[in-house]
């Protein structure tokens, strides 16, 4: 996960950048990476760690989608409003150092992530060494931009309410995925935010 980086020193984020998580989630993921590293050192078990940025979207067929209880991911939470499951969406902080004051994230479609997993397994089966790869589109969108795009996709006004910041939320997380493209041969195909949200909406409105 990109949460292993914490507050980045530069954008886009490289795999070689420092890892200083700012929340328990990122800390546990970084601990897992360290366990894999030491397992390799001790037993020669090679691994690939895939650092997802913001996983999102659903299968284009509309038959496979994302559901958590409780839900914590931004796009599914937004889509709960037009689905009649909540009255509004909360924006946690609008005073960040970004173009509209809300957090910026790099959204990557689940189908592209699935393809990266297949390529990572092939890489290891072909004798690849242990390594870490970022997975993102290299483009950031603010929370307000995501909400506005969801309004366009769904045709619903989706009321938004400004709430206090959440502790440990970095202002910007945008990936450099050039390493995955170069070494794994990964080619993400779903970079358009409107398309990503449309696939998610196709699933959520029927489930």
Please report, for each region that a protein language model flagged, where it lies by residue:
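A generic secondary-structure signal
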Residues: 2, 38, 119-123
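Amphipathic alpha-helical interaction segments
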Residues: 13, 33, 60-61, 125, ...
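Feature marks short, surface-exposed loop/turn motifs that line or immediately flank catalytic pockets
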Residues: 5, 56, 139-141
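Short, acidic Gly/Pro/Ser/Thr-rich loop/turn segments
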Residues: 57-59, 98
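Generic alpha-helical secondary structure signal
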Residues: 9, 29, 57, 121, ...
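C-terminal substrate-binding subdomain of Rossmann-fold SDR/epimerase-dehydratase oxidoreductases
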Residues: 74-207
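Catalytic helix-loop patch of NAD(P)-dependent Rossmann-fold dehydrogenases
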Residues: 3-54, 61-73
């Amino acid at each position: 996960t990109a949460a292993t980086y914490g507050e980045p020193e530069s954008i886009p984020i490289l795999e070689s950048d420092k890892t200083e998580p700012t929340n328990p989630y990122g800390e546990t993921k970084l601990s897992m990476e360290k366990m894999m590293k030491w397992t390799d050192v001790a037993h020669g078990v090679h691994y690939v760690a895939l650092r997802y940025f913001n996983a999102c979207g659903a299968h284009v067929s509309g038959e496979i989608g994302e559901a958590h209880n409780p839900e914590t991911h931004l796009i599914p939470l937004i889509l709960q409003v037009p689905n009649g499951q909540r009255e509004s969406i909360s924006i946690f902080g609008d005073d960040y150092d970004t173009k509209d004051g809300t957090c910026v994230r790099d959204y990557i479609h689940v189908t592209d992530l699935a393809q990266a997993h297949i390529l990572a397994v092939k890489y290891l089966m072909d004798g690849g060494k242990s390594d870490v790869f970022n997975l993102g589109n290299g483009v950031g969108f603010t929370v307000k931009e995501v909400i506005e795009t969801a309004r366009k996709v769904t045709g619903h006004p989706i009321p938004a309410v400004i709430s206090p910041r959440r502790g440990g939320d970095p202002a910007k997380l945008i990936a450099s995925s050039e390493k995955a493209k170069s070494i794994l041969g990964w080619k993400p195909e779903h970079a358009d935010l409107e398309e990503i949200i449309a696939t998610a909406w196709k699933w959520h409105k029927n489930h």
